[in-house]
């Protein structure tokens, strides 16, 4: 059995992630998805909780029939032991998929095979672009799987993002 690992923040999970994971699933029997910065939520750059991101991924990939594990991973501020931390928190995997230079370097230095897949329309499909559109009231739903729209609607995610993006100076008299 071949198992692959892919990590991201998924704030939110979007069609770029979805497309890449579908490609990974063609080469692997199962995909271990690391939900990075799991401890962060209710911030402009990280509005969704780890549990909400698990739901987004589970429902989107369930619809595609992709066997996967979504594992929340808290940040570890010591790069020298980061790979060991990941390995201790996830099911075993044979290959890592990433284009993040630090992630690639750390796994390669640990002797783990790393594949660097092409990014899927990176300029349009990015969490920061989607969050920007949410804040501006522009279309963001075309950039995420339908299951993600359902989760964000269920948790009132757009209004949460708008609330946490305000500054206290917005309330001065």
From Swiss-Prot:
Which residues lie in coiled coils?
none
Where is it found, in Gene Ontology cellular component terms?
A: cytoplasm
Please name the source species: Methanolobus tindarius
Which enzyme type, at the first EC level? transferase
**One MF annotation (Gene Ontology) recorded for this entry:** nicotinamide-nucleotide adenylyltransferase activity
Q: What is stated as this protein's family in its record? A: Belongs to the archaeal NMN adenylyltransferase family.
Its localization reads: Cytoplasm
Query: Which CDD domains does the UniProt entry name for this protein?
Result: NMNAT_Archaea
Which keywords has UniProt assigned to this entry?
ATP-binding, Cytoplasm, NAD, Nucleotide-binding, Nucleotidyltransferase, Pyridine nucleotide biosynthesis, Transferase
Its annotated pathway reads:
Cofactor biosynthesis; NAD(+) biosynthesis; NAD(+) from nicotinamide D-ribonucleotide: step 1/1
Name listed for the protein in its UniProt record: Nicotinamide-nucleotide adenylyltransferase
InterPro entries named among the record's database cross-references: Cyt_trans-like (IPR004821), NMN_Atrans_arc (IPR006418), Rossmann-like_a/b/a_fold (IPR014729)
What GO biological process terms are annotated to this protein in UniProt?
A: NAD biosynthetic process
Its Enzyme Commission number? 2.7.7.1
User: What chemistry does it catalyse, as a reaction equation?
Assistant: beta-nicotinamide D-ribonucleotide + ATP + H(+) = diphosphate + NAD(+)
For this protein, the record's NCBIfam families field holds:
arch_NMN_Atrans, cyt_tran_rel, PRK01153.1
């Amino acid at each position: 059995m071949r198992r692959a690992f892919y990590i991201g923040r998924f704030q939110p999970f979007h069609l770029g992630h979805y497309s890449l994971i579908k490609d990974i699933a063609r080469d692997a029997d199962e995909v271990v998805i690391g939900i990075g910065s799991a401890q962060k939520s209710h911030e402009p750059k990280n509005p969704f909780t780890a549990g909400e991101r698990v739901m987004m991924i589970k429902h989107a990939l369930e619809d595609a029939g992709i066997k996967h594990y979504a594992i929340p991973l808290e940040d570890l501020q010591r790069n020298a032991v980061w790979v060991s931390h990941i390995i201790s928190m996830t099911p075993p995997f044979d290959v890592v998929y990433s284009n993040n230079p630090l992630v690639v370097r750390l796994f390669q230095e640990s002797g783990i095979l790393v594949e660097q897949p092409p990014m899927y329309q990176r300029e349009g499909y990015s969490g920061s672009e989607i969050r920007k559109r949410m804040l501006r009231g522009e279309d963001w739903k075309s950039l995420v799987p339908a299951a993600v729209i359902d989760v964000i609607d269920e948790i009132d995610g757009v209004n949460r993002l708008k609330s946490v993006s305000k500054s206290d100076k917005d309330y001065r008299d």
